[in-house]
């Protein structure tokens, strides 16, 4: 489906409803995962049917899901498939994405059970892995050699500035990531590669090997902004194998092995943490030499949190701005002020400087790994991955004057809603 098409979903539409200043921990409780019938576990249905893959597979309830495995097959985001010319579609106010996001794929799927994720293990009873939505869109499966052939021959028109290999929690994921990376580096030397890692199955040696094979940037999807939210949404609270300590162990290894500016971590805002929690992680990652890649929580259809509200837009805007100040303006958390609830009430900078950053608009664009040009701080556009086009959270394009006026108003609302001032 095209990026503008909204998936049919039981997810409630919270837009326009009165909203609290932030999503508190008591509100943001995921449902408990239900038991999966034995005949649906570990991709049993797909393996029993054993339908042979025939080229590109687009998720479709009217067809048997083929038995596809990495490294021969990979899945890619809808935006990447449109950019590559594999799918037709329309993206609101943009014609392409500049990052080719690839996802490893197996009939068994991801063995983790993250509460906010459309790929989670608990969905085995409902949907085969290759048919699950992820970050709000379908991910068609494509022979990896076909992907490489298109990009290596210039079939993408030079639009991709980066490729990202997204690992999942699966016994083959580490080895297959190395295979996918090695083949890409050998054939597509002009597009650098990022690794979105799975720390749960990794060691320091794995990180070192990926660096040696030519990975340019290494990232960790920390996602949760404190230990409690992590455990509740992707650890023992939802029968998932991930550990806060293990994720930070691999993040520290990446900082040492890849070095400054060549590693980062994903953070999701709005899952029950405070502003102070988020920005504490942002500062910690920056102190190590890396960058934070921010996502606004938006309920994913089929996840254990699809009944919960998205992050309030005013809170999201103040976090986006504060994160940008820390990551790219040499600002520091210690200069900001927070109220007793942990809400940001003062950026700790003169109002004129804050206004200038808002007016530039870059702080409110999608954040991720950089592009090939020196001033391109994020090639990862992820069009509408954390919001519908009618209420954009992360802008996948340069903001125009109307967009700037809107985000400025939302920042003002965010600071007044937190009972504070915008600047010093």
Tell what function each PLM region has.
Residues 203-210, 271-287:
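Catalytic cores of alpha/beta
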Residues 177-193, 242-260, 313-330:
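Alpha-helix-loop-beta-strand connector modules within alpha/beta enzyme cores
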Residues 162-167, 262-267, 296:
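Short beta-strands and strand-loop turn motifs
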Residues 196, 200, 236-237, 250-276, ...:
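Conserved strand-turn element in the central/C-terminal portion of the radical SAM core barrel
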């Amino acid at each position: 489906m095209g990026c503008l098409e909204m998936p049919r979903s039981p997810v409630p539409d919270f837009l326009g409803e009165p909203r609290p200043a932030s999503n508190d921990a008591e509100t943001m409780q995921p449902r408990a995962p239900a038991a999966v019938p034995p005949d649906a576990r570990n991709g049993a249905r797909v393996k029993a049917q054993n339908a042979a893959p025939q080229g590109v597979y687009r998720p479709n309830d009217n067809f048997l899901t083929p038995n596809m495995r990495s490294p021969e097959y990979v899945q890619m985001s809808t935006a990447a498939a449109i950019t590559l010319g594999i799918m037709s579609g329309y993206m609101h106010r943009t014609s392409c994405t500049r990052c080719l996001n690839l996802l490893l794929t197996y009939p068994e799927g991801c063995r983790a059970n993250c509460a906010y994720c459309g790929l989670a293990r608990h969905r085995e009873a409902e949907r085969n892995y290759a048919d699950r939505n992820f970050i709000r869109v379908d991910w068609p499966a494509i022979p990896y050699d076909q992907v490489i052939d298109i990009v290596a021959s210039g079939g993408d028109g030079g639009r991709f500035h980066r490729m990202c290999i997204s690992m999942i929690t699966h016994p083959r994921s580490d080895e297959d990531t190395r295979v996918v990376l090695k083949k890409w580096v050998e054939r597509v030397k002009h597009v650098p590669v990022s690794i979105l890692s799975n720390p749960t199955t990794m060691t320091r040696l794995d990180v070192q090997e990926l660096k040696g094979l030519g990975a340019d940037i290494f990232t960790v999807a920390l996602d949760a902004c404190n230990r409690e939210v992590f455990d509740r949404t992707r650890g023992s609270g939802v029968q998932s194998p991930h550990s806060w300590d293990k994720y930070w162990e691999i993040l520290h290894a990446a900082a040492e092995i890849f070095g400054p500016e060549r590693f980062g971590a994903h953070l999701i805002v709005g899952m029950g943490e405070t502003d102070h929690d988020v920005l504490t992680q942002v500062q910690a990652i920056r102190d190590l030499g890396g960058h934070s890649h921010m996502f606004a929580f938006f309920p994913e259809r089929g996840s254990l949190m699809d009944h919960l509200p998205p992050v309030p837009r005013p809170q999201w805007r103040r976090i986006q701005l504060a994160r940008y100040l820390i990551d790219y303006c040499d600002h520091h958390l210690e200069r900001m002020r927070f109220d007793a609830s942990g809400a940001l009430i003062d950026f700790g900078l003169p109002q004129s400087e804050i206004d200038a950053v808002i007016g530039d608009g870059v702080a409110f664009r999608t954040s991720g790994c950089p592009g090939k040009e020196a001033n391109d701080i994020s090639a990862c556009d992820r069009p509408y991955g954390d919001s519908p086009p009618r209420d954009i959270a992360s802008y996948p394009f340069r903001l125009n004057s109307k967009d700037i006026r809107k985000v400025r108003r939302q920042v003002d609302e965010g600071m007044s809603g937190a009972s504070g001032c915008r600047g010093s």
